[in-house]
Amino acid sequence: MKDKYSLSRAENIFVAKKLFYEAIHCGAKLGDTNITLPETMTILNGVNVPNVTIDDIQTILNMRDAWRYVLKSVDDTFDLNYICSLNSYVSRNESIEWGVLRKGNVGIGGTNFKPKIPVESEIKNGIDDILTQDISVTDKAIKLFLFIARSQMFWDGNKRTSLLSANKILISQGKGVLVIPEKILNDFHIRLTDFYESNDYTKIDSFLYENCIHGIDYEQVEEQVENEEIDI
């Protein structure tokens, strides 16, 4: 699959900031929170929301901080250490440990797939294999997203960490933003479960490419990119 977008750094950062609330809400939903987009926006604006649990608020704030980190570290080297740094934001105060590879077994709800305990050298090789393939940046980002999610490298926050990792790759190369719209989350989870059990990327990669990679229309947004500031 070819890249859908070819954006300047300023344009891609602009897209990421425009989708900031949606991106955080997407991550929170991947973390199995029971929270709406308006509630997410209210929390991010510093206002308490009745009936939202402390755990869900923690998830939202962790995703906010993780996204801020991505946008400030776009030019940093992407490797396992960077992925661990993302997880240290994502899973802060939510897990046994955060920012380090898990040392015990975990299960994944809704599937019979049992990920093995991660071996650092194997994880590094898996990442390198994807990043050195002769494929588009978008294809690399999608494959990386799926590889990290399926590997279950951490005690918690694996899908959120994989989402942020993919976006680091996309934004650094001006190839858009990966955000899964809430209306297709159920379909996404069905396909992701199939991928977990089969390790067949074709179960889901085209779905993500067609529905979840977002960019800008040059003609409509050229002037706006230069003039608009978005506070995150």
Indicate where each model-derived feature is located.
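FIC/Doc superfamily catalytic core
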Residues: M1-I232
